[in-house]
Amino acid sequence: MVVKVGIAKLGNIASGVMGELLLDERADREDMITFMATSGTKLQPEDIERVVSNMKAWGPDFCIVVSPNGVLPGPTQAREDLAAAGIPCIVITDDVTTKKEQFEALKASNFGYIIMKADAMIGARREFLDPIEMADYNGNLVKVLALTGAFRKMQMELDKVIDQVKAGKKGADLALPKVVMTSDKAVDGEFSNPYALAKARAAYEIAQSVAGVNVKGCFMTKEWEKYIPIVASAHEMMRQAMLLCEEARTLEKGVDAVIRKPHKKTGEIVSKTALISKPE
């Protein structure tokens, strides 16, 4: 069978940039297809309704609802509307664990979730953030999530759900992920060199802390002379996290130990480390 995977992208976080691409990296899988509906950059009710209506019309076996601050009313309503239509949902969002009441409600619900703690909010001040700065920040963040192992763990969790659908499960019978992507979880099993692991773990910890700095610069500081250097420093932190990730991967390359786990056309995941070798 061919599994239908929906991606409802509401606003933007770095995890949403790569969502469906991580499941079909060479666009040659024959066991699943994806459909993305996006609200664009905004989270207005009419934008979200457009996404939900298009997703309902397509009728996926399950839907990934990816957004910043996934406990906001808009994303919450979107997944509830999809669930009411019989579509199982997995929430992918940035760190909402500090929002105790809403996060407890999410944990107690039937929704799956993957909380990407390092997918930190951007320094969205007009005096600092132009289109190029925005793209540069997201590029650095994507690299952090990729090279620490966070993206692989996210992809593996989603592939588990695809495998369940292929095995005949559907609807409420699907076991959906409930994962908080900490630094330890991200780097687990990704590195043979302990120094590479330490660098990647440091990168993830730095990226996690960027959100707090940007919250201070975007919401807690009123004087522009003060908030500009605050958000600029947050972006410099993300750049340093990215550089640590590159150093970690270079160390792994030096001992020919970079882990690669491609999909076969059937969806089976194979693995290799030595560069000049075939995945098995």
From Swiss-Prot:
Catalyzes the reversible reduction of methenyl-H(4)MPT(+) to methylene-H(4)MPT. This is F420-dependent methylenetetrahydromethanopterin dehydrogenase. Belongs to the MTD family. It comes from the Archaea. The gene is mtd. HAMAP family: MTD. One of its GO terms (molecular function) is ferredoxin hydrogenase activity. Pathway: One-carbon metabolism; methanogenesis from CO(2); 5,10-methylene-5,6,7,8-tetrahydromethanopterin from 5,10-methenyl-5,6,7,8-tetrahydromethanopterin (coenzyme F420 route): step 1/1. It comes from Methanoculleus marisnigri (strain ATCC 35101 / DSM 1498 / JR1). One of its GO terms (biological process) is methanogenesis, from carbon dioxide. Its EC number is 1.5.98.1. It catalyses: 5,10-methylenetetrahydromethanopterin + oxidized coenzyme F420-(gamma-L-Glu)(n) + 2 H(+) = 5,10-methenyl-5,6,7,8-tetrahydromethanopterin + reduced coenzyme F420-(gamma-L-Glu)(n).
